[in-house]
A protein has these predicted regions:
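Hydrophobic alpha-helical connector segments
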Residues: 41, 56-85, 136-143, 175-178
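Generic detection of well-ordered alpha-helical segments
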Residues: 2, 44, 48, 52, ...
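Short, charged helix-capping/linker segments at alpha-helix termini
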Residues: 10-11, 130, 134
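Short coil/turn segments at alpha/beta junctions that flank glycine-rich nucleotide-binding fingerprints
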Residues: 6-7, 61, 83, 127
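Helical hydrophobic small-molecule/effector-binding pocket
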Residues: 44-51, 67-95, 118-119, 144-157, ...
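Helix-turn-helix
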Residues: 3-37, 41-42
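Short secondary-structure transition hinges
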Residues: 77-118, 122, 137-140, 166-171
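C-terminal peripheral helix-coil segments that are non-catalytic and often amphipathic
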Residues: 78, 111-127, 145-191
Length: 191
């Protein structure tokens, strides 16, 4: 996973990985089939290394769906500081791979739901936090897409310094954006 995180999908070399592991390059291809197969397995491990929505503390869960969403969004920076390797692999998989591999990644995310988004949305509906008249799959997709993209935007400055020039290093502005994002989502799907 580290090779992909440091060098990207295109830059990572199977030869380097095999050398570091002390095995033949052919062994990697025999097991994973291709570099894409190896990356896909690294992506899956990275996804399952991230916390699921409902792994928030009980006190947060007791406050409901939107409090839990807020809790995780406010902790987005830990993805870069504490768990940068898996998060970087996720970013590369989401934005830096070819369409065939991206299709496999999308199928994995839908079929395996590594973040537990379906269960999280059902939790919100059962509590009455989320409108019951909305299609469950639509709400799950919205939460997945919007939260993922928003988290990526929150860490963009960390990943690509200088991309955003205005309001740099203003944590209060970031906190306000997180709360505004949760409020927009609450107005869209909240009951």
């Amino acid at each position: 996973m580290r090779h992909f995180a440091e060098d990207g999908y295109q830059g990572a070399r199977v030869e380097d990985l095999a050398e570091e592991l002390g095995i033949a390059k052919g062994s990697i291809f025999q097991h994973f089939g291709s570099k894409a197969g190896l990356f896909f397995e690294a992506y899956k491990r990275a996804a399952f290394a991230q916390p699921a929505w409902l792994e928030a503390p009980n006190a947060v869960l007791d406050d409901g769906f939107f409090a839990t969403l807020l809790y995780w969004l406010e902790r987005t920076e830990h993805l870069i500081r504490d768990d940068w390797i898996p998060y970087r692999v996720l970013l590369i998989g989401n934005y830096g791979t070819d369409l065939k591999l991206k299709r496999d990644i999308n199928r994995f995310l839908v079929s395996e739901d590594p973040y537990g988004t379906l269960e999280f949305v059902e939790f919100g509906q059962q509590r009455g936090d989320i409108r019951g008249d909305l299609d469950l799959e639509l709400v799950v997709s919205m939460v997945d897409w919007l939260a993922e993209r928003f988290q990526d935007a929150l860490v963009t400055e960390e990943l690509d310094p200088g991309l955003f020039h205005r309001h740099k290093d203003r944590p209060e502005r970031q906190r306000a954006r997180i709360r505004q994002f949760v409020e927009i989502l609450r107005r869209a799907i909240g009951s």
